[in-house]
Amino acid sequence: MTVLMAGCGDLGTEAGLRFAAAGHRVMGWRRSPEKLPAAIEGATADLSSGELPPIPADTTAVVVAIAADSPTEAAYRAAYVDGLSNVLDAVLGSGAPVRRLLFVSSTAVYGDAGGDWIDERTTPEPGGFSGRIIREAEELLSRRLRGTGITPVVLRLGGIYGPGRTRLIDQVRGGSAVIPAESRFTNRIHRDDAAAAIVHLCTMDFVPAPVYLGVDNEPAEMGEVLRFLASELGLTLPPSETAEGATQGEVSGTAQAGGTQGGGGPKTGEPSRGGNKRCSNALLRSTGFEFTYPSFREGYRAILAGVGVRHP
């Protein structure tokens, strides 16, 4: 099988390496393909520009793993809507026997659920522009692939953490972490599990569902995660926020840390992409997928032990 990774940053590269290890040919599109490991055939591509290289004639699976250049509405639209549209144009015009196309999305499409449980049946109600634009991209994917014979799969990831993604660890070490006064759930997935889920959904024998939530087994309150990290690091527990006690900077810092890594957040004036919800991964697990890092505890212990590298 030949797999096209349209967008090959840290997550896409890790997924590509896993496809290659399973014996598949992998083509990676990115602006700087010289940074890709030898197992991935690189090609220069700017997804948002529409100037894309030829798709290998034997491509049967496509993974679209896009990241916005900056946390602005324009950047999100250029990446997720324009970029996806350009990839779809290339795929549909290629004549390649593509049978499955997976779009890496985000749980930001759900917005804030007041701490309630959500799953794939929950109606998306994004609270900020990032979630709205990503949801627009999901709808574009479904509309464009309808009747083409290509199965669209949307993988809505929670906050990605892993090697080199150490924002919360750095906050605890630096003393800027603050435990929120209000109970607020966060949902995350280790980079390696996210990559493994991509490979699993693209290669499993039976037809996948239209949407899966890519989160670990345990939604966790932010305070619980911060206390755990402090304990693992042998540091004093972070202070708790009070109605009058925390500065605005402290509040903003914790809100940003709870969202999807690297996106949205207070810098843009929109609510944190993470929201307050508990995401269920039951549907993903029902396919036979198994997590290497079923909760934040195993994942952060691996990071603190220096396991893995972040791909450039």
Q: Can you name each region flagged by the protein language model?
A:
Residues 170-191:
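A conserved pocket-lining segment of Rossmann-fold NAD(P)-dependent short-chain dehydrogenase/reductase
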Residues 86-129:
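Conserved Rossmann-fold NAD(P)-dependent oxidoreductase catalytic core, especially the SDR/UDP-sugar
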Residues 272-312:
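C-terminal amphipathic/interface module of NAD(P)-dependent oxidoreductases
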Residues 197-200, 204-268, 280:
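Mid/C-terminal beta-alpha module of Rossmann-like enzyme folds, strongest
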Residues 114-154, 179:
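Catalytic helix-loop patch of NAD(P)-dependent Rossmann-fold dehydrogenases
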Residues 59-102:
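NAD(P)-cofactor binding segment of oxidoreductase domains
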